[in-house]
């Protein structure tokens, strides 16, 4: 039968953000973001820019990843993206793809000058595009490296001030080594202490559009507790990942929790659309 007006608005991407503004009575910038897997971080980046531009005093950034139809899963399986044994083993030699999961998350951003002791500080972020790579959905290591360096520059940080990175880490044969190489190039040259690298997807799967929000929650807990979570399902490190990270312990991929990574933490989210995002996070009041 004919679609109801509720269905027409209920499954419209533009209305997803508009509905929040309607319910909360917000009149500032309101944008729905779809850059595939990087959507959450691009939304956070956009909210931070709006605050810095004086367009609003605070911003609500939300992300939703729901599996309401079988077609996307069938397509991802046909493309060889999904783990055949249903386990996302990021960084592991036996990694064979990711597992789709669901998630919903929301956060409020406001200027640090408003006062928020003990809160998480977004000191800098960057959004870029893979551009020309091996294929439309293939990662581009050079673009990733440029993204990480750009985010550090916005934050005014040197690589040595970054104690860890919450990586995109999909557990794919191409994605993991590529990302390891870009992190090593941006963060690991001349380090005196290892860069602690993690990925939430090994624990909860890939929430896709909401995956960046899951990463943000993990980074928040790590920074507020001064501890780095271990990489679940990591048994034998992928030789290509080891090679790209470099010799001499330039980066640590802990299978058990670490006491501390120290300093700021990077957070990555890469969309298979080619749109990629990275941000630098720390605790308000920390150096």
Task: Give the ranges of each region predicted by the language model.
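Condensing-enzyme catalytic core of the thiolase-fold
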Residues: 1-287
């Amino acid at each position: 039968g004919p679609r109801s007006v509720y269905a027409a608005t209920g499954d419209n991407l533009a209305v997803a953000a508009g509905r929040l503004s309607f319910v909360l009575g917000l009149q500032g910038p309101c944008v729905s973001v779809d850059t595939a897997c990087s959507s959450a971080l691009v939304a956070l980046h956009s909210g931070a820019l709006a605050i810095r531009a004086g367009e609003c005093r605070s911003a609500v950034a939300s992300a939703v990843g729901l599996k309401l139809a079988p077609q996307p899963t069938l397509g991802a399986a046909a493309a060889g993206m999904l783990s055949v044994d249903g386990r996302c083993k990021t960084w592991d030699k036996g990694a064979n793809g990711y597992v789709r999961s669901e998630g919903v998350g929301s956060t409020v951003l406001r200027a640090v000058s408003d006062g928020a002791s003990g809160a998480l500080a977004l000191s800098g972020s960057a959004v870029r595009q893979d551009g020309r790579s091996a294929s439309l959905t293939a990662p581009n290591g050079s673009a990733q490296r440029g993204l990480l360096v750009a985010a550090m520059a916005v934050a005014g940080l040197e690589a040595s001030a970054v104690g860890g990175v919450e990586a995109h880490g999909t557990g794919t044969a191409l994605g993991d080594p590529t990302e390891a190489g870009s992190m090593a190039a941006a963060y690991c040259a001349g380090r005196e202490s290892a860069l602690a690298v993690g990925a939430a997807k090994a624990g909860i799967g890939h929430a896709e559009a909401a995956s960046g929000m899951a990463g943000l929650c993990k980074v928040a807990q790590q920074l507020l507790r001064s501890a780095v979570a271990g990489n679940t399902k990591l048994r034998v490190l992928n030789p290509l990942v080891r090679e790209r990270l470099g010799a001499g312990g330039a980066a640590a991929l802990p299978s058990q929790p670490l006491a501390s990574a120290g300093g700021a933490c990077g957070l990555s989210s890469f969309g298979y659309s080619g749109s990629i995002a990275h941000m630098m996070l720390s605790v308000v009041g920390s150096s």
